[in-house]
């Protein structure tokens, strides 16, 4: 069974479960992406900053699948923001990936200190008009960044990919996304592994005969989130995709949601201005 599709505000759709390759070493990436595609994944999420676009693209090319069957996402790094720099960075990314278009291109971080994300998004819009990108979105944007972006460009991003897990469920931001028609995508959906041994999570998982990771992925799905768990282990990659044959109860959902404590595992987008 394939992943359900989430409709985007531009008329396109994205598979709800994909493989993320953040912190996947280049030497492991090709094998991980190949395992994911063999297991049925049709959505792969990389970024220029990950250093593994080339290996991601090679795995897709060698999979036997048509390019149109794989939803491919990459991200523009902070040092490449700005209109002209973005156009050049895009060409470099698709060259490394070995493709001629992207399904989704994201601004990796707002980098508020540089104040270039509006010009960057205007370049994204041009690339979309030119048929090089199907959907354009952002990552790690807070409400204030989204408002400036939309007010300045008149374009609502299709997706905002944010740190999101039971410890940091991002309720207010998800509510804003719903109001604006932005799809919510979760990075570090398993809390970087910190939740996999939590008795609340393992209890819910065991009641369904599932793993803790599967229960967490299902929690995201039932909230409506797009989710991109990361693994280099072929068995775990396959297991993380085996999440379409069960459903968490309202009590299960509430139990996992009760773990919220506001813990942020990654940088704060309001102050993260790193461009190295």
Swiss-Prot record:
<feature type="binding site">
    <location>
        <position position="230"/>
    </location>
    <ligand>
        <name>NADPH</name>
    </ligand>
</feature>
<feature type="binding site">
    <location>
        <position position="231"/>
    </location>
    <ligand>
        <name>NADPH</name>
    </ligand>
</feature>
<feature type="binding site">
    <location>
        <position position="190"/>
    </location>
    <ligand>
        <name>NADPH</name>
    </ligand>
</feature>
<dbReference type="InterPro" id="IPR036812">
    <property type="entry name" value="NADP_OxRdtase_dom_sf"/>
</dbReference>
<feature type="binding site">
    <location>
        <position position="232"/>
    </location>
    <ligand>
        <name>NADPH</name>
    </ligand>
</feature>
<keyword id="KW-0560">Oxidoreductase</keyword>
<comment type="similarity">
    <text>Belongs to the aldo/keto reductase family.</text>
</comment>
<feature type="binding site">
    <location>
        <position position="236"/>
    </location>
    <ligand>
        <name>NADPH</name>
    </ligand>
</feature>
<feature type="active site" description="Proton donor">
    <location>
        <position position="50"/>
    </location>
</feature>
<dbReference type="InterPro" id="IPR023210">
    <property type="entry name" value="NADP_OxRdtase_dom"/>
</dbReference>
<feature type="binding site">
    <location>
        <position position="240"/>
    </location>
    <ligand>
        <name>NADPH</name>
    </ligand>
</feature>
<feature type="region of interest" description="Disordered">
    <location>
        <begin position="257"/>
        <end position="276"/>
    </location>
</feature>
<feature type="binding site">
    <location>
        <position position="228"/>
    </location>
    <ligand>
        <name>NADPH</name>
    </ligand>
</feature>
<dbReference type="GO" id="GO:0004033">
    <property type="term" value="F:aldo-keto reductase (NADPH) activity"/>
</dbReference>
<protein>
    <recommendedName>
        <fullName>Aldo-keto reductase Mkms_1985</fullName>
        <ecNumber>1.1.1.-</ecNumber>
    </recommendedName>
</protein>
<keyword id="KW-0521">NADP</keyword>
<dbReference type="InterPro" id="IPR020471">
    <property type="entry name" value="AKR"/>
</dbReference>
<dbReference type="Pfam" id="PF00248">
    <property type="entry name" value="Aldo_ket_red"/>
</dbReference>
<dbReference type="InterPro" id="IPR018170">
    <property type="entry name" value="Aldo/ket_reductase_CS"/>
</dbReference>
<feature type="binding site">
    <location>
        <position position="239"/>
    </location>
    <ligand>
        <name>NADPH</name>
    </ligand>
</feature>
């Amino acid at each position: 069974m394939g992943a359900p599709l989430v409709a985007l505000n531009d008329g396109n759709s994205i598979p709800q479960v994909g493989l993320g390759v953040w912190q996947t070493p280049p030497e492991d990436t090709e094998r991980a992406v190949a395992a994911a595609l063999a297991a049925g994944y049709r959505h792969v999420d990389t970024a220029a900053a990950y250093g593994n676009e080339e290996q991601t693209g090679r795995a897709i090319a060698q999979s036997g699948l048509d390019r149109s069957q794989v939803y491919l996402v990459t991200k523009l790094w902070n040092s490449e923001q700005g209109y002209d720099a973005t156009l050049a960075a895009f060409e470099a990314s698709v060259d490394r990936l070995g493709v001629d278009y992207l399904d989704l291109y994201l601004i990796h971080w707002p980098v508020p200190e540089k104040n270039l994300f509006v010009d960057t998004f205007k370049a994204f819009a041009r690339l979309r008009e030119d048929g090089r990108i199907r959907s354009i979105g952002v990552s790690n944007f807070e409400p204030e960044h989204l408002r400036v972006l939309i007010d300045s460009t008149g374009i609502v991003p299709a997706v905002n990919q944010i740190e999101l897990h039971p410890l940091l469920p991002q309720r207010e931001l998800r509510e804003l996304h719903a109001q604006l028609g932005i799809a919510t995508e979760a990075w570090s959906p398993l809390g970087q592994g910190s939740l996999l041994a939590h008795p609340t999570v393992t209890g819910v998982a065991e009641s369904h005969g599932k793993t803790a990771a599967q229960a967490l992925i299902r929690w995201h799905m039932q909230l409506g989130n797009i989710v991109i768990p990361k693994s280099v282990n072929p068995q775990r990659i396959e297991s993380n995709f085996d999440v379409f044959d069960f459903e968490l109860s309202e009590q299960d959902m509430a139990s996992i949601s009760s773990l919220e404590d506001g813990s942020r595992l990654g940088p704060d987008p309001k102050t993260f201005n790193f461009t190295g």
